[in-house]
């Protein structure tokens, strides 16, 4: 076999894992990423990667990398430009969004599912625009592959990364949730269910 199939077998997994869904990168618009790309750079690279992967296995599903979050200055132009290149080869575009209440504003916090709703509608509209522009036949669906309430541990995480950067396995991202957080998570789940015709995958992060 190949180097990596032999490596898998040596770790006790004889047969291939038959993974059928692959994301073509992660948050590639982020300046904090090593290897960050412009939308054209990413779109061209992702399209060629997708073509190669589907030559090996035409049954796989591929996810085009969406914006890191809705506050990125290139959102939603990133999605529009990258899909110009990847539309013919991918099945999904990824969405990432986290929610918090650092100002202890319960009313605003409980309404943040409306922000998710607007985010989903914007990405759907962008996907459908590219479909129409390319006179395509297929819908690009959504993979909301990073979402959660996340803010309680931010200060502690920042302190760890700044003052103790070389710890082995530091305690990071360990939020302690409240009933208020649970209500918001419920509202976010309802929002995704409302759009389940296009939000086909979602991963709590």
Feature map (PLM): residue ranges:
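Generic recognition of stable, solvent-exposed alpha-helical segments in well-folded globular domains
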Residues: 41-44, 48, 77, 88, ...
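Extended catalytic-interface subdomain
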Residues: 88-159, 188
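Aromatic/acidic polysaccharide-binding cleft in carbohydrate-active enzymes
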Residues: 137-205
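N-terminal catalytic cores of secreted or lumenal carbohydrate-active enzymes
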Residues: 1-100, 104-105, 117, 121, ...
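Short secondary-structure boundary/capping segments
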Residues: 38-40, 77-83, 109-111, 157-164, ...
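A structural signal for short coil/turn segments at secondary-structure junctions
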Residues: 57, 86, 135, 196-197
């Amino acid at each position: 076999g190949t180097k990596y199939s032999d490596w898998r077998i040596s770790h006790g997994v004889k047969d291939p894992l038959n993974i059928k869904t692959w994301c073509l990168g992660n948050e590639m618009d982020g300046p904090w990423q090593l290897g960050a790309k412009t939308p054209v750079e990413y779109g061209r690279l992702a399209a060629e990667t997708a073509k190669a992967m589907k030559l090996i296995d035409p049954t796989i599903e591929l996810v085009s990398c969406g914006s890191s979050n809705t506050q990125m200055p290139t959102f939603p132009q990133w999605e529009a430009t990258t899909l110009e290149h990847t539309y013919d080869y991918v099945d999904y575009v990824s969405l990432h969004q986290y929610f918090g209440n650092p100002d202890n504003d319960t009313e605003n916090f409980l309404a943040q599912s409306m922000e998710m709703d607007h985010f989903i509608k914007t990405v759907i509209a962008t996907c459908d625009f590219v479909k129409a522009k390319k006179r395509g036949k297929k819908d690009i669906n959504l993979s909301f592959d990073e979402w959660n309430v996340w803010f309680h541990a931010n200060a502690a995480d920042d302190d760890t990364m700044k003052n103790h950067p070389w710890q082995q396995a530091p305690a990071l991202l360990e939020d302690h949730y409240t009933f208020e957080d649970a209500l918001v998570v419920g509202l976010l789940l309802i929002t995704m269910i409302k759009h389940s015709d296009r939000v086909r995958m979602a991963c709590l992060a």
